[in-house]
Swiss-Prot record:
One of its GO terms (biological process) is 'de novo' IMP biosynthetic process. One of its GO terms (cellular component) is cytosol. This is Phosphoribosylaminoimidazole-succinocarboxamide synthase. It comes from the Bacteria. PROSITE patterns: SAICAR_SYNTHETASE_1, SAICAR_SYNTHETASE_2. The keyword Nucleotide-binding applies. Keywords: ATP-binding, Ligase, Nucleotide-binding, Purine biosynthesis. Pathway: Purine metabolism; IMP biosynthesis via de novo pathway; 5-amino-1-(5-phospho-D-ribosyl)imidazole-4-carboxamide from 5-amino-1-(5-phospho-D-ribosyl)imidazole-4-carboxylate: step 1/2. PANTHER family: MULTIFUNCTIONAL PROTEIN ADE2, SI:DKEY-6E2.2. InterPro entries: SAICAR_synt/ADE2_N (IPR028923), SAICAR_synt_PurC (IPR033934), SAICAR_synth (IPR001636), SAICAR_synthetase (IPR050089), SAICAR_synthetase_CS (IPR018236).
Length: 237
């Protein structure tokens, strides 16, 4: 399948058309952004790590009943995917308090959330992805009620799968974001799962092993990404 012109350039990935109208190529760049793209830095190997990390996780989810857009790993930093009609609603699930939740509610970072908290955000960088609820989705026709329920079900299912995968390797899955789209009128998991869109802490030390290392000037960003990948079994060779 031939790679064609650029379709979309995001903060850390570039999407390309292909010679088949139903498929795209995701290119994972070495860019890493914070503050809704206002600050972008580059780290060697980052695109490769996230591409292979994402491919590994998406396949694990697909094996356990979650439909994903993943088709084929093409190279160190490229993956062939289904072309989805993306839904502008992000599903965030939180197993522990961190990030914006701590700031909004004034609760202690690391507080265990039982049951896990599922939040919805309107995907819009210029408005800093405001938090919304199901009523917003209906009123503004962001996603149908049926599809929203399906997205929430799949997010909870993914959380059940992923918390076990990471826990077995000594990692706490603190929270993560998922994005969905439509393919042949079916809800499909799209975008990516990587340390860019999740929070991951070491179980023993609570060391942060995700993009918070950049947000909080902790250093060792790529080293942390690589350690998580290797622990859970991602082949980086």
């Amino acid at each position: 399948m031939k790679k064609l012109a650029e379709f979309y350039r995001g903060k850390a990935k570039t999407v390309y058309h292909t010679s088949h109208p139903s498929f795209l190529i995701l290119e994972f760049r070495n860019d890493i952004s914070i503050l809704d793209g206002q600050c972008i830095k580059q780290f060697d190997r980052k695109g490769m790590i996230n591409n292979k990390f994402n491919f590994f996780i998406m396949n694990k989810l697909a094996e356990l009943g979650i439909p994903t857009q993943i088709e084929q790993l093409l190279s160190d930093n490229e993956t062939l995917v289904k072309k989805l009609d993306m839904i502008p609603v992000e599903c965030v699930i939180r197993n522990r308090a961190a990030g914006s939740l701590v700031r909004r509610l004034g609760i202690e970072e690391g507080q265990i959330l039982n049951p896990p908290l599922l939040e919805l955000f309107f995907k819009n960088d210029s408005m800093h992805d405001p938090i919304i609820n199901a009523s917003y989705c209906t009123t503004f026709n962001l996603v149908s009620d049926t599809n929203l329920v399906r997205m929430q079900q799949l997010t909870k299912h993914a959380n059940n799968i992923l918390t076990k995968i990471f826990d077995k390797k000594g990692i706490i899955l603190v929270d993560f974001k998922l994005e969905f789209g439509l393919f042949n009128n079916q809800i499909i998991l799209g975008d990516e799962f990587s340390p860019d869109v999740s929070r991951l802490w070491d179980k023993k030390t609570l060391k942060k092993m995700d993009k918070d290392r950049l947000r909080q000037n902790l250093g060792g960003v790529i080293e942390a990404y690589e350690e998580v990948a290797i622990r859970i079994g991602v082949s980086l060779t």
